[in-house]
Every structure is written in structure tokens, then in C-alpha cells.
Design a protein with these regions (language model features):
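Active-site proximal loop and beta-alpha junction motif in alpha/beta enzyme cores
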Residues: 1-74, 80-277
């Protein structure tokens, strides 16, 4: 049995317990794939990450990201949470830039005061949903075509299909059909009312097992930001919200700089200690 430093951090939250929690385990190089999967299933958080030594000199660290059911090549809030933990460890330093090695390659993370932001990775699949995919998406989310302005692939690792909805009323009224969702992952976005603090609101629905709604989702915000900004629907900098349906209050800072879109948020440690493995 070995003891490892362990954290649970709150990502994208401005108030305690209003973001998306993440478990982070340090010095995980000797852990087997099966053990990582077992630990992630036990923590039962949306994701658990394992800090490893990098395999390339360009990287600050390597990370593996697990849900309770499987491993992900990339995810947004685990990227920010893991980068924050790495930056807090003795002996680690950065000049405002951290390089994460993960399943999609190298991901840049920039640090500005308390704000951690990752560079949105390229989408593996984009373009509008075909007729069959669109029909399935409507059925899965109990929507009608009149409620949807556009629908596309926004797959940057997790496999998101994204829908731009008519308004926040439609977004907040979604009651997903988990059986119809199956193994798919759907993200929805709607513009906020004029005068709101945030410009867009999102929700994320992931199938598999019993299905769940994710409180605040970095990868989804990244793919939706790319989609909205390239269509000139969103400005180059905006603030998004997510999690209201679950009693959360996530805030996501989106900023486009040249060809890079940054997805940022605050990261706050809530639990620190050791885990015996």
C-alpha cells in the first residue's frame, strides 16, 4: 500500500461548492490502468485525474483522465483543476504558461492571477449533424425543430454533438430521454437575456450507464465557443454560465486571441490530504 497526495478541487466556481468537483492524485506513475479505473469508479466524481511524469521535454506534466466508467483523451475542467494542483506542488514553477500532456497531445494552460485557462484543442469532428443524427438529437432531448437554431458536431475528444437553442426558456426546460441518448453526448447553448451578467448559458448531457447532466463542462464550452465565434454569433470575449439546473453556478471565461480560443475559470481546493492505494 502506498500513500499519495490527494485533492478535490472546485472548478469554474466563484462560490464554494457551486462549480464542478475534480479529484486529483499525484505521483501516479506506478499505478496500473485497472487501478486508475477502479479509483475513479470509487470516487464517483465526473472525472478523476492522475498526475504523471511527462514523456516529452516540452510538457510540464502528463495526466490521465478517468470518468467512473472509462478513460477520456481530454476534458476541460480536469485540465484546469490538474494544472492548478501541479502549480501548487513544491518545486514546480511556470512563467504564466503550463504545458499539459494528455490523450490529445499537448495542451497549453495559461495562468493569470487566479484564472486558469486552457487553449481549446482542435475539433476531431465538426460540421452540421446529418438528418438522422439531428432527428436522434431532438428525440433524446425532447425538443422540436422550432426550438433549435442550428446543430453540429463539436467533438474535441469526448464526442459532443451541440445544439444552438432558440432561447434560455427552451434550454432550461429540457427533460432528456436518457434511454434515447444512449451512449451519445449532447451540449446545448442559448443566448442570455439582454442585460444579463453572462452572454450564453449551456447544459451538458452525457449518456452511458444511467446518464447524467454535467455541472460545468470545459470541453463543451471550448467546442461551442469555436462554433459560435467562427459563425460570428459570439463576440471574441464573453462570459458563459452552466449548472443552474443542478443548483450550481459555474462561470466560464471565453476569449479568442488570434487562432486560439481560451477557456478559463477559477480553481479552488476544497479537500486536501492523502489517499492510500
Amino acid at each position: 500500500m502506498s500513500d499519495h497526495a490527494y485533492w478535490q478541487v472546485d472548478v469554474f466556481a466563484r462560490q464554494a461548492f457551486k462549480g464542478n468537483p475534480l479529484a486529483v492524485i499525484a505521483d501516479a506513475d506506478h499505478l496500473s490502468d485497472a487501478m486508475m479505473a477502479q479509483i475513479a469508479n470509487w470516487t464517483n466524481l465526473s472525472e478523476t485525474t492522475f498526475l504523471l511524469r511527462p514523456t516529452t521535454p516540452e510538457a510540464s506534466y502528463r495526466v490521465r483522465i478517468f470518468t467512473p466508467a472509462h478513460e477520456l483523451p481530454f476534458a476541460g475542467h480536469p485540465t484546469l483543476g490538474t494544472a492548478s494542483v501541479w502549480a501548487s506542488l513544491p518545486g514546480n514553477s511556470h512563467n504564466g504558461t503550463i504545458i499539459q500532456e494528455c490523450g490529445v497531445g499537448l495542451v497549453r494552460v495559461k495562468v493569470e492571477d487566479e484564472l486558469f485557462s486552457f487553449a481549446a484543442p482542435p475539433r476531431k469532428k465538426s460540421g452540421r449533424l446529418n438528418d438522422a443524427e439531428y432527428t436522434q438529437a431532438l428525440a433524446a432531448l425532447n425538443l422540436t425543430s422550432e426550438m433549435v437554431l442550428d446543430a453540429a458536431w463539436g467533438d474535441n475528444g469526448p464526442g459532443w454533438q451541440v445544439l444552438h437553442l432558440r432561447d434560455q426558456t427552451v434550454l432550461r426546460g429540457i427533460k432528456p430521454d436518457w434511454q434515447a441518448i444512449g451512449e451519445a453526448k449532447y451540449g446545448v447553448v442559448a443566448a442570455c437575456a439582454e442585460g444579463s451578467e453572462t452572454q450564453f448559458e449551456l447544459r451538458a448531457f452525457a449518456g452511458g450507464g444511467q446518464g447524467y447532466e454535467d455541472p460545468v463542462t470545459g470541453s463543451l464550452n471550448a467546442s461551442i465557443a469555436q462554433w459560435l465565434i467562427e459563425r460570428e454569433i459570439a463576440p471574441s470575449r464573453y462570459l458563459a454560465s452552466q449548472g443552474a439546473a443542478l443548483g450550481r453556478d459555474g462561470r466560464i471565461v471565453v476569449e479568442s486571441e488570434g487562432n486560439t480560443i481560451w477557456i478559463g475559470g477559477l480553481v479552488t481546493p476544497r479537500i486536501t490530504g492523502t489517499i492510500s492505494i
